[in-house]
Amino acid sequence: SSNDLNEFTLPVWVAAAAKSATNILNGHKFKDIEVIDLPNKEKSLSVPISSSSLLDNGKKSLAVSHCKSGLSLDVTRGLEVWAYIQFNKITGHPQKTVQNDFPDWLDFHAGYGVGKFESSGEPCLSKFALDLLCINLYPLRPKGFAIKVEIIFPEGKDRALRTSNEAFGVVDGLSLIGTQAEAQISA
């Protein structure tokens, strides 16, 4: 048997780290596996988490996952993913992010090593990546609060130099693209 090798695309590892950090901030014990639900509800995935901790006297949290994409040439293989989480009270006027249709409860920040569009400075992430975050984080949100998510790829900037991202107007790191959960092994 191939023994489920946890070969998922980068958005899955990002959602898993964000979910782990959100659970920790909600007072739950660390689990080294997070279950990630997929947008079409066809199934859920068990995703390994390396570590997670509270920070700043329990006001923030951080979780780390390591991307195993299964493709030996894939620039994301072995990439360390950091997710910082913070809960912020939603005030009377929740602001919508114009470009990427982020819901008002999700305050997404592309941190160091995460690709941004050169033209707008907006984070470069696919609808699939955003949907994964929304589906998996929304149920964990404390009532009346927004979840601030900052994703960091410590090696993202260096690894992006090995991609043609810049030709597509993406700078500063690796883009969070991908339209499916499992890494495709092409023949």
Where are the regions that the model predicts?
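N-terminal loops that bind phosphate or other acidic moieties
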Residues: 1, 5-31, 37-43, 52-187
